């Protein structure tokens, strides 16, 4: 609240107090007519500090009006040390509502209430608070007549503080009190807190179990669909996140080697996937076809003969004819790199290439990426492992 607003409020007070001063005018005139003793004039009373006058004027107003004036003006009150003015708290927190109840029962009668003890976990303070509260109050019982309600936390029994005491000891103290029981209760939300805490623990346990099932399903999916076998199960979480990122970026399907494999079922199933590593790595061809029956591989070519002066080179189409129908099986062929041993000469190399064409069809082509595994490792920060560890054993 600004000083301008306070001055306006003081002017309103003076306007309302004007009629009262006019009614008291005769008394004041009589007082003026009375003789005054001779002598030096008395010193005038020192004016109070401006802050004291403001606080004295504010104490006469209702707190609601002060709150409204502060909200409208957007200002703050000047602070004064040692001031007796305090904001009144009309909405006391339920956790601070303590009450003392006295329960009286007959000789063959019970108090008519039930208690429970829960442990509330405080993660910030790393401790467990044991709270004993009233969970049920019977109708027309001494507890109900005394004003005991469900949800009241028991703070003391017969003047003895029971905070932190075990449940069995509290029950023994209540039973040993006789026909008169004096309880100090603290109303709070202990029941609701305990229920929510138990529910939270149950949901966490369920989430942990479901997460384990999800990880096992991810392992099976990666093994069946992509042929990946990794010892570290955390790699599957990374693969899933990378795949979702690639889907969101629009790179799949089609741009990566396994892009068409993850396409919709309505897409073309026939095709070939090829991933080529470095010069020291082997080359793998995995083909997926759709059809009724598998086709037998063409027979190996006859041994090479020295070409004569009038003979010509045997074309690859004669050695390996074109494939007939589509296959329904998936196969993986490992082809030795150039100079990789295993001999056979030019006809052996031609037969190997023709055999790859017979398996993978005419759609076999090399992707523009050197190694998909090397590209995938760029998306996985901190994963510095050799390529042999993630290599598929097909």
From Swiss-Prot:
Chain positions covered by the region annotation Interaction with PSCD3? 180-257
Q: In which tissues is it expressed?
A: Expressed in brain.
Location of Phosphoserine modifications: 93, 386
Q: Say yes or no: keyword Cytoplasm present.
A: yes
Q: Which gene encodes it?
A: Tamalin
> Which PROSITE patterns does the record cross-reference, listed alphabetically?
PDZ
* InterPro entries linked: Intracell_Traff_Signaling_Reg, PDZ, PDZ_sf
What function does this protein fulfil?
A: Plays a role in intracellular trafficking and contributes to the macromolecular organization of group 1 metabotropic glutamate receptors (mGluRs) at synapses.
Topological relation to the membrane, as annotated: Peripheral membrane protein
Record-level Gene Ontology MF annotations: identical protein binding; PDZ domain binding; small GTPase binding
This chain belongs to which protein, by name?
Answer: General receptor for phosphoinositides 1-associated scaffold protein
On subunit structure and binding partners, the annotation says: Heteromer. Composed of TAMALIN, CYTH2 and at least one GRM1. Also interacts with CYTH3, GRM2, GRM3 and GRM5.
According to its UniProt entry, this protein's organism is: Rattus norvegicus
Compartments it resides in: Cytoplasm, Perinuclear region; Cell membrane; Postsynaptic cell membrane
Key words, A-Z = Cell membrane, Cytoplasm, Membrane, Methylation, Phosphoprotein, Postsynaptic cell membrane, Synapse
């Amino acid at each position: 609240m600004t000083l301008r607003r306070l001055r306006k409020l003081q002017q309103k007070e003076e306007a309302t107090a004007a009629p009262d001063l006019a009614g008291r005018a005769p008394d004041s005139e009589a007082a003026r007519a009375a003789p005054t003793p001779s002598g030096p004039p008395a010193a005038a009373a020192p004016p109070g500090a401006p802050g004291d006058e403001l606080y004295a004027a504010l104490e006469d107003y209702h707190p609601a009006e002060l709150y409204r004036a502060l909200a409208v003006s957007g200002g703050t009150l000047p602070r004064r040390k040692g001031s007796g003015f305090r904001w009144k708290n009309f909405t006391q927190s339920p956790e601070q509502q303590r009450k003392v109840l006295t329960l009286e029962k007959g000789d063959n009668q019970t108090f008519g209430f039930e208690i429970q003890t829960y442990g509330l976990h405080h993660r910030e303070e790393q401790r467990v608070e044991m709270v004993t509260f009233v969970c049920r109050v019977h109708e027309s019982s001494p507890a109900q007549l005394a004003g005991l309600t469900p949800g009241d936390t028991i703070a003391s029994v017969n003047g003895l503080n029971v905070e932190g005491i075990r449940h069995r000891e509290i029950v023994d103290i209540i039973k040993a009190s006789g026909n008169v029981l004096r309880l100090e209760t603290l109303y709070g939300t202990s029941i609701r807190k305990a229920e929510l805490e138990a529910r939270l623990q149950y949901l966490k346990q369920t989430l942990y179990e479901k997460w384990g099932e999800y990880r096992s399903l991810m392992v099976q999916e990666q093994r069946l669909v992509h042929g990946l076998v990794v010892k570290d199960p955390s790699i599957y979480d990374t693969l899933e996140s990378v795949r979702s990122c690639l889907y969101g970026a629009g790179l799949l399907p089609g741009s990566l080697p396994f892009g068409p494999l993850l396409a919709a079922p309505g897409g073309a199933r026939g095709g070939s996937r090829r991933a080529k590593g470095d010069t020291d790595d082997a080359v793998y061809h995995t083909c997926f076809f759709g059809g009724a029956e598998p086709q037998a591989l063409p027979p190996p070519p006859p041994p090479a003969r020295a070409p004569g002066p009038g003979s010509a080179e045997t074309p690859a189409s004669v050695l390996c004819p074109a494939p007939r129908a589509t296959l329904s099986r998936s196969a993986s062929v490992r082809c030795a790199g150039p100079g990789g041993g295993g001999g056979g000469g030019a006809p052996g190399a031609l037969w190997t290439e023709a055999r790859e064409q017979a398996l993978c069809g005419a759609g076999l082509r090399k992707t523009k990426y050197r190694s998909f595994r090397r590209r995938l490792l760029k998306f996985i920060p901190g994963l510095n492992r050799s390529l042999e560890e993630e290599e598929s054993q097909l």
